[in-house]
Amino acid sequence: MQQKHKYIKMEKLIATFEDYSIFKADAKCINELSQFIVVENYKHHVGTVEASQLADDIADVTKEELELYGDNTYIYIARNNQGKMLGSIRVFLWNRQSELPLEKIYGINPLEAIHSDVKFNYWHVGRFAIDSTSGISTFTLFKRLMALAVQPIVGDSDSYMIAEIDSKLLKVMNALGFVTNQLGDSIYYLTSETVPISSSKQGIMGFYSKYGCLCGVA
């Protein structure tokens, strides 16, 4: 096992499967993470893009992720046995001070749109991407990454998930058991129609109770 994953520097092994492993990473992976997310979004939704546009988007995502990163940030990445990134997702506990993507893109503040009561915590889930050409089951990997991302929300007594979700992916999430609330109109962001949503801890449990076991987190 040590030999297989010797290339990993600041990543903690979470689970190993036949074709890939999932790691918990830290801020040192944000540059690689941002490039992966932007490239995969363009591959999936557009196909081709100018190099300058790609570079600008990667820089924007990197800057935003570094600004939002904190002690309660969890980054999960999947790598194949050669170390190539195959998938990613990130969740963080909002400190009520940093500007959320939800605010920046949609002008929506969770304290106004959901609850202002200080007892509620808001966890932002984002930066989900999967390499659809990897040959693995992307659907299974999605469920594994999402189960890991919502784990801290499920473990928090009064909590909400907030996110900006691709409209097609949102339909999949709802079919898998999420109960979501749309917070505003969709906007075209990073190559796809994106919907601002929230989900309470109870709304997450329909998914988590079924699929949390995929990574041994439930």
Q: What spans do the regions from the language model cover?
A:
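Acyl-donor binding region in acyl/amide transferases
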Residues: 102-180, 184-187, 191-194
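Short beta-strand micro-motifs in enzyme catalytic cores
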Residues: 72-76, 121, 193-197
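Feature marks short, surface-exposed loop/turn motifs that line or immediately flank catalytic pockets
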Residues: 93-95, 132, 169, 203
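Short, His- and charge-rich active-site/binding loops that engage polyanionic ligands
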Residues: 82-109
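Intrinsically disordered, low-complexity, positively biased terminal segments
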Residues: 2-7, 68-72, 92-97, 205-218
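Short amphipathic alpha-helix that is part of the acyltransferase structural core
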Residues: 7-64, 69-70, 75-79, 85
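C-terminal "cap" of GNAT-fold acetyltransferases
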Residues: 190-213
